[in-house]
Design a protein with these regions (language model features):
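N-terminal Rossmann-like NAD(P)+-binding domain of SDR-like oxidoreductases, especially those catalyzing
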Residues: 3-195, 320, 325-331, 337-346
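Short, solvent-exposed loop/helix junctions and linker helices
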Residues: 18, 111-114, 165, 169, ...
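Generic recognition of short, well-ordered alpha-helical segments
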Residues: 27, 54, 80, 101-104, ...
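C-terminal substrate-binding subdomain of Rossmann-fold SDR/epimerase-dehydratase oxidoreductases
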Residues: 35, 41, 51, 70, ...
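Short glycine-/small-residue-rich flexible loop motifs, especially phosphate/cofactor-binding loops
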Residues: 79, 121, 177, 209, ...
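Conserved active-site helix of classical SDR/Rossmann-fold NAD(P)-dependent CH-OH oxidoreductases
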Residues: 117-118, 170-177, 207-210, 238-239, ...
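A glycine/serine/threonine-rich, flexible loop-to-helix segment
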Residues: 147-148, 202-210
Length: 346
């Protein structure tokens, strides 16, 4: 195996960012397009229900950004894009990511998250990409017991998935590792905890709480609400991804966590309090099938090797996030009404 080891130092590089109109990907686009004006960035997104062109529309005014509508599973489209653009780096944010949807319809998760990853890596090999980065999730590790707060996920924690979603992401991670070992594709993988911040599609916990509470509707909470998640602000996550892409060791996995564990019920109560809404809006509903108990990440590898650190604590980050939603209620309304689907005219 010959691996094309390459450290990115910036300057006149061309990046493909897949899934760049989604929540995490669009925040990443805003971060890198403004931070690295000397580099070129192409965003590829299929604009499925969770992809919103409005998230990145203003970036098209920048000289170093271009949007392309397309699906990562479309082998012909992807190959032509690689041929035309001659990418140096590929960062794959594109994914079906809602656990509940994966329980109802696993097939699309396998297609997008595994086959789509294969299509991107085949093109990366064919066209000599210098670095392929896979954005993954801590859910591939399964869950941790609630009564063992000392336990954390490390990069050596075995994969032990609970849902079709996490299984599809784990399958993609294993395939990425296989392409590194078998074909010498220079890869890195990041696994993050639960993200929050601006532009999050209102199907995930925090924007669901906001949109329901603002309408004085019942806020659904699975089970007893005691399941624990580690929360990381999307900006901190994306800074970590950028450091891994540019300085991470080829073939390695890096965990990125927020060190901010909260029960789901605590998160709900925190947001209701900030909005001045009554806890009477909370409605406990039947628990999710196979609901993971607790996620908690050890990020010491990224901290020590790459100098990565979080800048947001949960209290400040959630306040800033809710303030953003309050200031951008038209964005929320466009999504809830479906009007956002008409934003892209290309």
């Amino acid at each position: 195996m010959v691996v094309r080891e390459f450290k990115i130092i910036g300057g006149n590089m061309k990046f493909l960012i897949t899934g760049g109109a989604g929540f995490i990907g669009s925040n990443y686009c805003h971060y890198v397009v403004n931070k690295y004006p000397e580099d070129q960035f192409v965003c590829l997104d299929a604009l499925t229900y969770a992809g919103n062109y409005n998230n990145i529309k203003e970036l098209e005014e920048k000289d170093n950004f271009k949007f392309v509508k397309g699906d990562i599973t479309d082998r012909e489209l992807v190959d032509k894009l690689f041929e035309d653009e001659k990418f140096d780096v590929v960062i794959n944010f594109a994914a079906e990511s809602h656990v509940d949807n994966s329980i109802k319809n696993p097939g699309i998760f396998l297609t997008t998250n595994i086959i789509g990853t294969q299509v991107l890596m085949d093109a990366s090999l064919k066209h000599g990409v210098k670095r392929y980065h896979q954005v993954s999730t801590d859910e591939v590790y399964g869950d941790l017991p609630l009564d063992r707060p000392d336990l954390l996920f490390t990069e050596d924690t075995p994969i032990h998935t609970s849902s079709p979603y996490s299984s599809s992401k784990a399958g993609a991670d294993l395939l990425v590792g296989a392409y590194y070992r078998t074909f010498g594709l220079p890869v890195t993988i990041s696994r993050c905890s639960n993200n929050y911040g601006p532009y999050q599609f209102p199907e995930k916990l925090i924007p669901v709480i906001f949109s329901k509470a603002m309408r004085d509707e019942k806020v659904p909470v699975y089970g007893t609400g005691e399941n624990v998640r580690d929360w990381i602000h999307v900006h901190d996550h994306n800074v970590g991804v950028d450091l891994i892409v540019r300085n991470g060791k080829v073939g390695e996995v890096y965990n990125l966590g927020g060190h901010s564990e909260r029960t789901n019920l605590t998160v709900v109560k925190t947001i209701l309090k900030q909005l001045g809404k009554s806890e009477d809006l909370i409605e406990f509903v039947e628990d999710r099938k196979g609901h993971d108990l607790r996620y908690a990440i050890d990020s010491s590898k990224a901290e020590k090797e790459l100098g990565w650190n979080r800048t947001y604590n949960f209290e400040d980050g959630i306040k800033e996030t809710i303030d953003w939603y309050l200031e951008h209620q038209d964005w929320v309304e466009d999504i809830l009404s479906g009007e956002y689907k008409e934003a892209y005219k290309g």
